[in-house]
């Protein structure tokens, strides 16, 4: 009888653990699907740096990555964040805005300038933003500056 109870408990816990592994796998897959960079193709516009985080893994770590978002049609940095949250909603991923600024994007010159700050979210780490932008714009000159709004 004790063996039967132990076997049932093992099966129950095994199924639970398999379910957890599946959730983490789904979370990792969802995280992998989030593009690192989504900015307008040209112009000067506000941008934000966001940390996207998956579910905590069995070893206690939380998989995450930094993403850059910037759109000319968003009047406020908060508008960019809301749009991004809307695209991630329902995936089980969490987001945190780490700050913002502006981007000047000139595709003819293959040039990006990352500068300024967000009044609401503070200044993003422009060096980190540059690192993320380089994943998409490998052959661009990317300048960073703490000057300007």
UniProtKB/Swiss-Prot annotation:
GO terms, biological process: cell differentiation; sex differentiation
Positions of transmembrane segments: none
Active site annotation, chain numbering: 77 (proton acceptor)
Keyword Ion transport: no
Keywords for this protein: Differentiation, Sexual differentiation
Alphabetical list of Pfam families matching this protein: Ocnus (PF05005)
GO cellular component, one term: cytosol
A molecular function (GO) term: protein histidine phosphatase activity
Gene3D superfamilies reported in the protein's UniProt record: Janus/Ocnus
Family: Belongs to the janus family.
PANTHER family assigned to the protein according to its UniProt record, in alphabetical order: BCDNA.GH02250-RELATED (PTHR12258:SF5), JANUS-A/JANUS-B (PTHR12258)
Role this protein plays: JanA and janB regulate somatic sex differentiation.
Name of the protein in question: Sex-regulated protein janus-A
Species this protein is from: Drosophila pseudoobscura pseudoobscura
Gene name of the encoded protein: janA
